[in-house]
Regions:
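Intrinsically disordered, low-complexity regulatory regions
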Residues: 1-153
Length: 153
């Protein structure tokens, strides 16, 4: 079978989770989908720190506009358990605590919406959110000179 470098490039599936990131991100709203994508793929990008910073941007945009958002998940309700299972797999294999925590936060938001809770982030206070964002920023600075081969070798 030929490799499809346009629709399913091998490097998009070449991760410890063994799942193409779009299987998760295509089911989330724009901000959380982008944040999850950047968190899941930063180690394979030319400028890893930049991708972590992009994730921070989208997480902050999400948090600032949380009251205006209609939905976190854009798939059918019966598809959410499978989506959460894939998200949890990405969390399980992530070895950097602040990246894993951010992914878990997005997963919690999906679960909260699925459980029809009033607020999409009931398990994360504003202080905890700020710590998560600060930790991501610090981590991005700490990997500023790293390249993908530094994570995979």
């Amino acid at each position: 079978m030929a490799v499809d470098n346009v629709n399913h490039p091998s490097h998009y599936c070449n991760n410890k989770a063994g799942i193409e990131v779009i299987e998760v991100t295509g089911n989330l709203n724009f901000d959380l989908g982008n944040a999850f994508k950047y968190l899941a793929r930063y180690k394979s990008k030319k400028l890893p720190a930049e991708d972590v910073k992009k994730a921070v941007f989208y997480l902050n945009h999400f948090y600032a506009n949380i009251q205006k958002l209609c939905k976190i998940v854009v798939c059918a309700e019966e598809e959410i358990p499978a989506l959460v299972k894939k998200m949890e797999r990405f969390c399980e294999v992530e070895d950097v605590p602040c990246i894993r925590r951010a992914m878990e936060t997005i997963t919690q938001a999906v679960l909260a919406e699925y459980d029809h809770l009033d607020h999409p982030l009931p398990l994360l206070s504003e202080a905890e959110w700020n710590i998560t964002i600060a930790d991501l920023k610090t981590y991005a600075e700490s990997i500023a000179d790293k390249k993908p081969e530094d994570f995979n070798g």
